[in-house]
Regions:
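Cell-envelope/extracellular polymer assembly enzymes that use nucleotide-activated donors
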Residues: 4-8, 39, 193
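Short, well-formed alpha-helical segments that are part of the catalytic scaffolds
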Residues: 14-31
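A conserved acidic beta->alpha catalytic loop
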Residues: 26, 44-53, 73
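Glycine-rich, basic loop-to-helix element that forms the pyrophosphate-binding segment
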Residues: 71-88
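Short aromatic/hydrophobic "clamp" motif used to bind/position activated sugar donors
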Residues: 93
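Donor-binding/catalytic cores of nucleotide-activated saccharide
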Residues: 101-205, 217-226
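Membrane-interface aromatic/basic loop that binds lipid-linked glycans or pyrophosphate carriers
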Residues: 119, 276-345
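Nucleotide-sugar-dependent glycosyltransferase catalytic core
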Residues: 186-187, 204-237, 251, 274, ...
């Protein structure tokens, strides 16, 4: 590897409101500049706005830092990240969403932690903000102390269950390359598959207990609009996670963890976000969620992680659906109708 760090930035239609500029400015202004040789790999995922023009302008201004990779067709974020991984030269790999930004010392602190501890995976916390600022907003703890240190089987189990966001970490490139790790393409929620799977291959995880990453909350964010297409993408991510874990020999050793993550992603999260967020939900889709989960894990509701982490109300509703899909569907829709009436008063 000829560089210390490769930062991969998937970009799709982020030209408006200075979002892309603010992200790129935070990357070229890193304090590691001059300390380490690093690269910023900007993958334009067939944008239909001026994103590519902005990227090419930054590449012209910072030729020693920025390399633009234009995709001819849209591959979604996972595919864009894969294109960056194909050409990355860094000893370490970092990812950032193109509408977010990072503190000037973000990568310096993560790399320093890696050098001090010998970790091959380093993360931090993040700040929720609704405008461009370096003032800290609501702080979200991304990972916890019991997940850090040398990754024993027990710690791998905890990290698999709650891997945290992938953009808040740097990854030793050799681990990615040697284990053929990449992202699902053509779907939303690619990290739902990649995050847990990747975590099983790293041997030492450390974290910087500071909110060094700024997560920009706005209305066009992937996670803020629920459609059946996006719900199906989450289901697909869960299926891919199951398949990858099975094919890579993890299904026996980490069965309870895989069962829970599959149930959470494919069924529980998707079920309630679908019913709450889609205007005209379909009973057939709700039935599909239950059957798809029971196909792999017929006794998912006895899983210890499910019993521990799934809320009592959600468990009650899912138990109702297991007895009668129609009764559950009618009950939930009526309850939601009543809530909406009260909210409009």
């Amino acid at each position: 590897m000829s560089k210390k760090l490769s930062i991969i930035v998937p970009v799709y239609n982020m030209a408006a409101e200075g979002k892309l500029n603010y992200c790129l400015d935070s990357l070229v202004g890193q304090t590691i500049r001059g300390l380490y040789d690093y690269e910023i790999l900007c993958v334009d995922d067939a944008s239909t706005d001026a994103s590519l023009e902005i990227l090419l302008d930054y590449e012209k201004r910072y030729p020693e830092l920025i390399h633009v990779i234009p995709n001819a067709v849209n591959l979604r974020q996972g595919g864009a990240k894969n294109e960056g991984l194909k050409v990355a030269q860094g000893e370490w790999i970092g990812f950032i969403d193109s509408d977010d930004w990072v503190s000037p010392d973000y990568y310096e602190k993560l790399l320093q932690k890696a050098e001090e501890t010998g970790a091959d995976l380093v993360g931090c916390d993040y700040s929720l903000v609704d405008h461009h600022t370096f003032e800290v907003g609501k702080v979200i703890v991304n990972n916890t102390p019991e997940q850090t240190g040398e990754l024993t089987k027990e710690k791998h189990e905890i990290l698999f269950i709650r891997p945290g966001s992938m953009v808040l970490k740097i990854y030793r490139h050799s681990v990615i390359r040697e284990n053929c790790l990449d992202f699902p393409e053509h779907i939303f929620y690619e990290d739902n598959c990649a995050g847990p799977l990747w975590s099983l291959y790293f041997r030492h995880f450390e974290r910087v207990e500071e909110p060094l990453y700024y997560y920009y909350q706005h209305e066009v964010s992937t996670v803020h609009h629920i459609t059946e297409e996006k719900c199906r993408d989450r289901m697909r991510a869960a299926e891919l996670l199951y398949t990858e874990c099975r094919n890579r020999g993890f299904l026996t050793e980490y069965k309870e963890q895989i069962e829970y993550r599959f149930t959470e992603l494919y069924y529980a999260i998707t079920l309630f976000s679908y019913l709450s967020g889609v205007k005209k939900p379909k009973l057939s889709f709700v039935i599909e969620l239950r059957l798809g989960t029971e196909k792999h894990f017929p006794e998912f509701d006895k899983n210890p992680y499910y019993l521990q982490y799934t809320g009592p109300e959600e468990q009650k509703l899912i138990a109702m659906q297991k007895k009668s899909d129609l009764r559950f569907f009618v009950y939930y829709r009526l309850r939601q109708f009543v809530w909406n009436l009260r909210a409009s008063d």
